[in-house]
């Protein structure tokens, strides 16, 4: 939407960025300076009992700046981009009605995109077809399915990594159900967000610094009891590695360690690598984002000042 068209709309703020980039710290600081209420945009923070491995805001941070849409589901429950849009729009309306500004913070870019552009008319999940895809993957490997996707939907195959079974499975499922590719259907997006949105992306200017932060944070999680947290989940009979909650970065690798598939050092190595890959994907998404103000997380005071100036303009 053009500035002229959005002038009469209520304001919203997006704080986006890769994992370990300082999004929470910036949002908590903004809460001290602006009349904002925070909404989490994170597909892992929605789950209860998954606090350490998701780097959930601390008790102190939550006291300073309560986050909505955190701890709303059990790890056994599914949650889609459509579910998020429904919940986020409701929270945003409540915040706006109270005379405050919704500040949406997180790293799940698909949720931000769905909220901004509206959801595409994608078919609902089909358990039978999904099971067939999982069976084929078990027999042939996900690389073979990725090659299949390249023939069906080359554009989606470029976006989706062979090591991302959740998105790969969904792309194939959509085609098998509808006869149309994911790329075709995602061009038919819904209504745009009825807010004047100020979008910010925060990340260190140097990639090496982000890598160092990710490694340090993973070790800090282990020292804080991450293994014990996942052991409690592993002991439950209703949770398994194919659930979105257990597929979360860090949890999947710890699960493999607890099941005896890999040793402790390999778990650490894979956990850090997977987190770096996630950060790379998040940055790639953001580089293609329109109308975003980039902030350097290694200069938090300057980042805060930039947001204040843009929002107040």
Curated annotation (Swiss-Prot):
Monomer. Keywords: ATP-binding, Magnesium, Nucleotide-binding, Transferase, tRNA processing. It comes from the Bacteria. ATP binds at residues 17-24. It comes from Photorhabdus laumondii subsp. laumondii (strain DSM 15139 / CIP 105565 / TT01) (Photorhabdus luminescens subsp. laumondii). The record marks 108, 130 as: Interaction with substrate tRNA. It is an enzyme of class 2 (transferase). Its EC number is 2.5.1.75. NCBIfam families: miaA. This is tRNA dimethylallyltransferase. One of its GO terms (biological process) is tRNA modification. Pfam families: IPPT. GO terms for molecular function: ATP binding; tRNA dimethylallyltransferase activity. Its cofactor is Mg(2+). Residues 42-45, 166-170, 247-252, 280-287 are annotated as: Interaction with substrate tRNA. Substrate binds at residues 19-24. It catalyses: adenosine(37) in tRNA + dimethylallyl diphosphate = N(6)-dimethylallyladenosine(37) in tRNA + diphosphate. Catalyzes the transfer of a dimethylallyl group onto the adenine at position 37 in tRNAs that read codons beginning with uridine, leading to the formation of N6-(dimethylallyl)adenosine (i(6)A).
């Amino acid at each position: 939407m053009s500035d002229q068209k959005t002038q009469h709309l209520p304001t919203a703020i997006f704080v986006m960025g890769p994992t370990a980039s300082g999004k929470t710290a910036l949002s908590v600081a903004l809460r001290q300076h602006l009349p904002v209420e925070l909404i989490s945009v994170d597909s892992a923070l929605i789950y209860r009992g998954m606090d350490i491995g998701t780097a959930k805001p601390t008790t102190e941070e939550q006291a300073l700046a309560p986050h909505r849409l955190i701890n709303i589901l059990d790890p056994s429950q599914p949650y889609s981009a459509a579910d998020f849009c429904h919940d986020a729009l409701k929270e945003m309306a409540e915040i706006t009605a109270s005379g405050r500004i919704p500040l949406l913070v997180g790293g799940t870019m698909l949720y931000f995109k769905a909220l901004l552009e509206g959801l595409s008319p994608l078919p609902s999940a089909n358990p039978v077809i999904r099971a067939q895809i999982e069976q084929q993957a078990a027999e042939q490997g996900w690389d073979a399915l990725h090659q299949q996707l390249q023939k069906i939907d080359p554009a989606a195959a470029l976006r989706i990594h062979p090591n991302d079974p959740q998105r790969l499975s969904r792309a194939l499922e959509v085609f098998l159900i509808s006869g149309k590719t994911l790329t075709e259907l995602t061009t038919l997006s819904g209504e745009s967000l009825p807010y004047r949105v100020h979008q910010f992306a925060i990340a260190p200017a140097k990639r090496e610094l982000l890598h160092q932060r990710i490694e340090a944070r993973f070790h800090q999680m282990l020292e804080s009891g991450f293994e014990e947290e996942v052991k409690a989940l592993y002991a439950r009979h209703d949770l398994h590695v194919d659930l979105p909650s257990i597929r979360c970065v860090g949890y999947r690798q710890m699960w493999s360690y607890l099941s005896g598939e890999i040793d402790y050092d390999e778990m650490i190595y894979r956990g850090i690598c997977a987190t770096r890959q996630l950060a790379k994907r998040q940055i790639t998404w953001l580089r293609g984002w329109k109308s975003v103000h980039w902030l350097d997380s290694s200069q938090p005071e300057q980042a805060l000042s930039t947001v204040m100036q843009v929002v107040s303009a």
